[in-house]
Regions:
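Charged docking surfaces used in two-component/phosphorelay signaling
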Residues: 187-361
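N-terminal Rossmann-like NAD(P) cofactor-binding subdomain of oxidoreductases
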Residues: 1-205, 237, 309, 315-316, ...
Length: 361
């Protein structure tokens, strides 16, 4: 790419916005030129607006420190400065729906980390390794919006990243039923231990809205395109409990699974480690070389050892074994703010760029 695409971050001061800025530092295709946030941050430099709330392990990139924060509601102005935007705004669902459509209608593609449009029939919800073919509904979405280049694409919830890829890898065996419990790090709530001290040594057995997303969203990712819309898959049936645990980054899933055609353990592992998709074939900049790793040790995957596998863009699976009530059980782990949030959205944007949906204005 001769000239980098100009990128704006909507909701740039929050945790996911910060992760976008951190991941996009020195990106070969994209350059952050605009940061937008709430009216109270507007007019300040990015450094001033974030203040002591920078939550990343790496320092704030020099290139963004002096960018003046724009008001995210000033849609025309923000859109005029960029080729496309990443959305991580913190608003009500209806407000997010409206503002993302408003940006799309300025002919600015929107790649969103938010849940507001995940069930809009002509908005693709994509894990690029699994369902990059769903991008084809964008042409129908553009007709609805009356745009030529503006559209919305979203990524699914962070909680499903540690088991949904397995379902795609094992498709030929017909995953039929899943019982899942997720153990989710506190960064998923936009927090650190500094600002959520009551999570130290604690477990909270409820995360609002998360169980429904964890049960339903994999079916949309595994669905198919029909008549310009995405029709969700019928199977597998999924039941899920989601638990907040005292870990900073990383979502772990304990999964029990039944298949229509029960495979051997060796077949399952072989399919996992061989699984690849469009990002690997196209050698996208953020793509993990090996999307899924299988760990043989009994005590893996562990957050401290494995959450940053493939720079946080890969998925780690372990403890696959036969079960007395189900066919198999296993443990999965993914990085919730990299693969599960900003990193997954960056990979989506790379896939959209490689396929010609995003280009310079």
């Amino acid at each position: 790419m001769e000239q980098k695409l100009k990128v704006g971050i909507l909701g740039a001061t929050g945790m996911v916005g910060q992760r976008f800025i951190s991941l996009l530092e020195n990106h070969p295709w994209f350059e952050v030129v605009t940061v937008a946030a709430s009216p109270r941050s507007a007019g300040k430099t990015y450094e001033e607006a974030v203040g002591d709330r920078w939550k990343m392990d790496t320092p704030m990139p020099e290139a963004v420190k002096k960018l003046v924060v724009l008001n995210v509601n000033d849609v025309e102005h923000v859109a005029s400065t960029v080729d496309f935007v990443f959305s991580a705004v913190d608003m009500s669902k209806d407000e997010i729906k409206a503002i993302e459509e408003a940006y799309a209608k300025t002919e600015t593609p929107v790649v969103s980390n938010n849940s507001a449009h995940r069930w809009t029939p002509d908005v693709p919800m994509v894990v690029p390794e699994i369902n990059a073919d769903h991008f084809e509904v964008i042409k129908d979405q553009k007709k609805r919006l009356g745009t030529t280049r503006g559209f919305i694409a979203v990524k699914p919830n962070c909680s499903i990243q540690s088991y949904a890829p397995c379902l795609a890898a094992w498709k030929e065996f017909g995953p039929k039923e899943l019982v899942v419990t997720t153990y989710q790090g506190i960064s998923g709530a936009g927090k650190t231990f500094k600002d959520w001290p009551e999570m130290v040594g604690n477990i909270i057995p409820f995360i609002g809205g998360e169980e429904e997303k964890s049960e339903q969203e994999p079916l949309r990712v595994l669905g198919k395109v029909e008549n310009g819309q995405i029709v969700k898959a019928e199977l597998p049936k999924i039941t899920c409990q989601c638990v907040r645990v005292p870990v900073l980054n990383g979502h772990t899933a304990a999964v029990f699974i039944n298949f229509e055609k029960k495979p051997t353990k060796e077949q399952l592992i072989e399919k996992l480690v061989a699984f690849k998709g469009f990002p690997q074939e196209a050698e996208l900049p953020s793509a993990p070389k090996q999307f899924i790793q299988y760990l043989e040790e009994d005590n893996r995957p562990q957050v401290t050892e494995d959450v940053n596998y493939e720079r946080g863009m890969g998925v780690s699976i372990g403890r696959l074994r036969e079960d007395t009530m189900f066919d198999y059980k296993f443990i999965g782990l993914s990085h919730n703010t990299v693969r599960g949030a900003a990193g997954g959205a960056v990979l989506c944007a790379e896939a959209l760029t490689a396929k010609g949906y995003i280009a310079a204005k």
